[in-house]
Amino acid sequence: MLGRTLREVSVELKQGQITPTELCQRCLSLIKKTKFLNAYITVSEEVALKQAEESEKRYKKGHSLGDLDGIPIAVKDNFSTSGIETTCASNMLKGYVPPYNATVVQKLLDQGALLMGKTNLDEFAMGSGSTDGIFGPVKNPWSYSKQYREKRKQNSHSENEDSNWLITGGSSGGSAAAVSAFTCFAALGSDTGGSTRNPAAHCGVVGLKPSYGLVSRHGLIPLVNSMDVPGILTRCVDDAATVLGVLAGHDPKDSTTIQDPVKPFTLPSLTDVSKLCIGIPKEYLTPELSSEVQSLWSKAANLFESEGAKVTEVSLPHTSYSIVCYHVLCTSEVASNMARFDGLEYGHRCDSDVSTEAMYAATRREGFNDVVRGRILSGNFFLLKENYENYFVKAQKVRRLIANDFVNVFNSGVDVLLTPTTLSEAVPYTEFIKEDNRTRSAQDDIFTQAVNMAGLPAVSVPVALSSQGLPIGLQFIGRAFCDQQLLIVAKWFEKQVQFPVIQLQELMDDCSSVFENEKLASVSLK
């Protein structure tokens, strides 16, 4: 049951094959069994069971609120949740309980979704591994999959060697792990430079970054206001579309959202791709790209071509400047946004009574980790009067050039861009932490951050397993506010590749009934 898609289990709820309470209890049981993954910071068991009880009453009366009624979901812990602690995985906000819900959270609850809990992340969403929060790193469920462990056996590695568990990617690693491990059917992440798509690729799930302005940011604790977007993590493209249909639309509390109303939609099944033009950005073929990802990228392009689509190489000439441009703009906005955490209104406050200035300094020293403090320092440097024109203003100009590159490509007749999501599959934690956060983020955001600067929709779709038995994802990028068209193409591709279901039986042999109906599908691109 828990291995099914959101839409499938929604049908079973409506038919009475399972009740919301039974579904909720199964998810809660699995959350407890997979606690070692560290996917959740807070498990809202009482809240979820109460919501399930209310959902059950509606179903009995025949008054279902829609496809999300009674569906267990999880929310990244940088979205405000009324009455539930919201920490951003930081000492600065540990113990902070917001008095309101983020708009996206409220929209899900209004549709009857069950909030299972708040998921783990890098502190204030600054990172690409979900390793730097105060609650510890998130473990990738695929570390314990039958597929990965069998490959390790073949390579003479110890099957029980837990020191080589894999990172989830970040910063929405908790949400990706929660969906991948079947503890919920959908989860909210945030995406500033790839923080939803990166962990989606590493955890073998779908990660959608909507167009900037399509989904409200109200209640998302800001990192970079001009790039932050609530992200969606699900096990299939159809489910991502279902959640997007609920979340999208104008919000008077977020002036950047679109004015036009957005209706929920169901993705049609595309049968003919011959009229599509798929663009392959030549600048994304970098020396650091693993041979396996490169091979799958090429095979995916060939798949479209073999079905009649036009596949053409395109140029995004300012790509080489994008990661530096992103760093300048990101840290500058971080410095501005983090200024609100001064110990006066909410969050952590140091006991220092020497002076107000001393209290500010001590509060921020105790509340923020080295990564956050480092980004604040970088941002303040770029915003200094003597540096403002040479760094911040120039970066804004380069950002416009990067956005124009995408506009020019789409105006040339390209419908969708096809790129890698990450340079390689997930790496072991011990290998990941050999490099500092900033270096890792610069490497891991290489294919994803330009989309945020351009405000475009993008989705990472799992494609196949690597030779190590680990997921690899590819990214589709669409025109601004053409999210539905993007998802239609992604759905067609998903159907062709038939990504295999994660096999966790060996890990949870006492929970085999959860997975007994799942079949290992063949992978057509391997």
Swiss-Prot record:
The active site is at 76 (charge relay system), 171 (charge relay system), 195 (acyl-ester intermediate). Keywords: ATP-binding, Ligase, Mitochondrion, Nucleotide-binding, Protein biosynthesis. It is found in: Mitochondrion. GO terms for molecular function: ATP binding; glutaminyl-tRNA synthase (glutamine-hydrolyzing) activity. The keyword Translocase does not apply. Its EC number is 6.3.5.7. GO terms for cellular component: glutamyl-tRNA(Gln) amidotransferase complex; mitochondrion. One of its GO terms (biological process) is glutaminyl-tRNAGln biosynthesis via transamidation. It catalyses: L-glutamyl-tRNA(Gln) + L-glutamine + ATP + H2O = L-glutaminyl-tRNA(Gln) + L-glutamate + ADP + phosphate + H(+). Residues 147-166 are annotated as: Disordered. Its main location: mitochondrion. Allows the formation of correctly charged Gln-tRNA(Gln) through the transamidation of misacylated Glu-tRNA(Gln) in the mitochondria. The reaction takes place in the presence of glutamine and ATP through an activated gamma-phospho-Glu-tRNA(Gln). NCBIfam families: gatA. This is Glutamyl-tRNA(Gln) amidotransferase subunit A, mitochondrial. The gene is QRSL1.
